[in-house]
Amino acid sequence: MSIETSATERRIRVALVFGGRSGEHEVSCATAAGVMSALDPERYEVVPVGITKDGRWVEGPSDPDALALSKRATITDGADVLLRLDASRELVVDDDAGGVGGAARTLASVDVVLPLLHGPFGEDGTIQGLLELADIPYVGSGVLASAAGMDKIAMKILLAAAGLPVGPYVAVPPRRWATDPDGVRAEARALGLPLFVKPARAGSSVGITRVTDLNDLDAAIEEAQRHDPRILI
């Protein structure tokens, strides 16, 4: 996909998508604030789209100060934004969300999207796939690279297959901890201390525990599973 609109004809219309359902919602908002401040207004027209913690797409604030990390900003409300999947690249606003025959208006026909979502639903290939379906150019890795890069277990498998050195690990699929906890404990014990227990598909250091005593392993696994049923030790 390419950005067909020339900057000499008009400003490039950039949709910033931020917030989201992950535990890094506030950090994503702060990222949007930084990008808003950095984009040259003579070259780019910014279209802010926020995603609430429960997954609603809404018109986002256009003032970067309102999204500063120091304010721990969250996206909570706004007119619903819908993304057309008909290759028109249009974002449509429903001014009467939930109503019958609500008024809809075109917010913008965007040239490119900057996905500024952190963690699940933002860096894992999901929004990238949605934008591919809508035929909207976007910044960043594609679906496969995003999905593989987000999944720590998949990435280790790919690196090992490419002949690169990979540290020893234990992959714990969703049902294994429930059905074979003793087996997981035994494999983890064989790795030696300290252990790092991680959600396989969470961003930053969310849900990660450093284990220096095997008596703390169960609690670390349960903490990681709060963020992802697949975990890595």
Cite the ranges covered by each PLM segment.
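Active-site nucleotide/adenylate-binding loops and adjacent lid/helix of ATP-dependent enzymes
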Residues: S2-V17, S22-G23, A30, A103, ...
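Conserved N-proximal alpha/beta basic substrate-recognition cap immediately N-terminal to
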Residues: R10-R13, E24-A33, S37, P41, ...
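Short flexible/disordered coil segments
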Residues: I75, G119-G122, A178-T179, R230-I233
